[in-house]
Amino acid sequence: YGNPGSFHTIGLRPKRAIAKARELVRDLINAKQVKEIIFTGSGTESVNLAIKGITEKYDTGHIITSTIEHEAVTETLYYLEHTKGWDVTRVPVNKYGLVNPKDVEDAIRPDTKLVTIMYANNEIGTIQPIEQIGKICRKKKVLFHTDACQAGGVLDLNVENLKVDMMTLNGSKIYGPK
């Protein structure tokens, strides 16, 4: 293993590999710049970085999510509610596990800083209307994060089409390196 932060040959090889991987992911999701691609150790770490990264900018605020999110999201939001004073609205899903975009829109308040909705649910197979929710968030000027770990390699990941500000992917789902 070479340290990609080093300036010797053993370190330069992984540095180039990481740079190439960033370009590949940028192209896969249609991100504007490679600097928008951040690698973490897991999907959970990525979810935490996205959510906590936004909430660090503010003392408190409001976040919208659904009632069927992955524990990476629910535990992070529970922490923010109970230790940092954030208010979290959990929009319901219908009998098929779908979020109604209108419910998200109706839940947005002046202090809403973030909406975070899972793209695809691996337990029940639901694919959320991410593009519709993304359009609402853009219109209301609210940041939008989607946990797309289960969608990687299967569904459209174009962040411009989906109107997603932050997307969590997991390398194990898209043949990424460990």
Indicate where each model-derived feature is located:
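Pyridoxal 5′-phosphate
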Residues: 1-178
